[in-house]
Regions:
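Active-site Tyr-X1-5-Lys
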Residues: 1-27, 32, 56-58
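Glycine-rich "substrate-gating" loop/helix at the edge of Rossmann-like oxidoreductase active sites
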Residues: 1-4, 32-46, 66-78, 103
Length: 169
């Protein structure tokens, strides 16, 4: 456990317990690897896909830590917004929802898909895997599915849309 994860967990518990204590409808959400238009690739909190996008557009090298087999549960920003709307209108249960697709995708597979979409080969600089990096990440989205939410954006379509936005701006 890291201080970051402990803080996130404590915030979730506070939100849920506050709602129960005062009978206020509250939920907490966990956003997994969100990407999409207007994401700032220069932020220290930026997701890997915004950094890859910037490197592709500016023909700059991308540093890949490890072999690229590490997985993430990527979710497009429009699906995040739709999930938040669904949660806010369909439930009063004080609980935690994971907002993601529920799929594991390796970083190297995402990079290859993106290269295919944009027609540019990413200049990759490989470095040793970082000890603190998570190797596998996949969200349990059963609660989200339980209120009728289903992601609308495939990885390919969302990356295509993201590239279109980023290349025009």
């Amino acid at each position: 456990m890291t201080p970051y994860s402990i803080d996130k967990y404590a915030s979730e518990r506070y939100t849920i317990d506050y709602g129960r204590l005062y009978n206020i409808p509250t939920v907490a959400v966990r956003l997994f690897n969100v990407y999409g238009p207007r994401q700032n690739p220069n932020s220290e909190y930026s997701g890997v896909l915004s950094i890859v996008t910037k490197c592709l557009k500016e023909n700059k090298p991308f540093t890949l830590y490890g072999d690229g087999s590490q997985t993430r549960d990527f979710v497009y920003v429009e699906d995040v917004v739709n999930a938040l709307i669904k949660i806010s209108t369909e439930t009063n249960e004080p609980t935690v929802y994971n907002i993601a697709n529920g799929d594991e995708t390796s970083l190297i597979d995402v990079i290859h898909t993106y290269e295919e979409i944009v027609g540019i080969k990413l200049n990759i600089i490989k470095k040793e895997a970082r000890q603190e990096d998570i190797n596998k990440s996949r969200a349990d989205v059963s609660k989200l599915k339980g209120i009728g939410f289903k992601p609308q954006w495939s990885l390919h379509d969302s990356l295509t849309n993201y590239w279109k936005y980023y290349s025009e701006n």
